[in-house]
Amino acid sequence: MSKQLTAQAPVEPIVLGKMGSSYGIRGWLRVFSSTEDAESIFDYQPWFIQKAGQWQQVQLESWKHHNQDLIIKLKGVDDRDSANLLTNCEIVVDSSQLPALEDGSYYWKDLMGCQVVTTEGYDLGKVVDMMETGSNDVIVIKANLKDAFGIKERLVPFLDGQVIKKVDLATRTIEVDWDPGF
């Protein structure tokens, strides 16, 4: 398979996808992309996987569409048994490969862990997840243990200007115009 590269492990790892089940007998694998455009995952190289706590760099040899799936062939993975060993491995790159964003645009990874407060100063909790819906993204906020409204989790639409009033990544805070009772 591929050689282990400890010196070239990702400094700031970010998961862009996951390897699925093997396809055929020649080492092809299904791949599930988390990028906005599924094929964009192939723009980011090199890929890393983590096996037994060690980073390994894997080289993409080829990829193609098969029905609704994307399938990949990795260098050195030439049979079904080798491919099966990679099933469910996350595809990781160094976040320095991601392009710079315009003002007002954010990578989900940068919003994770941010404290969310209302425009009135009520502390809603911390961002623990993001969801993509048909119309807009939604931030999942884990409420503080002693939340006055007894809410454990809040779903707040990420609508810049309407709901999201200010994002300050330096202080890790997001200000929202949102009723704490929701």
Curated annotation (Swiss-Prot):
UniProt GO cellular component terms: cytoplasm; ribosome
Q: Which residues form a coiled coil?
A: none
Q: Tell me where in or outside the cell this protein is found.
A: Cytoplasm
> Which controlled-vocabulary keywords does the entry list?
Chaperone, Cytoplasm, Ribosome biogenesis, rRNA processing
Domain PRC barrel, by residue range, is 103-182
NCBIfam families noted in UniProt? 16S_RimM
Q: Which family does it belong to?
A: Belongs to the RimM family.
Task: State what protein this is by name.
Answer: Ribosome maturation factor RimM
Organism this protein belongs to: Citrobacter koseri (strain ATCC BAA-895 / CDC 4225-83 / SGSC4696)
* Classification of source organism: Bacteria, Pseudomonadati, Pseudomonadota, Gammaproteobacteria, Enterobacterales
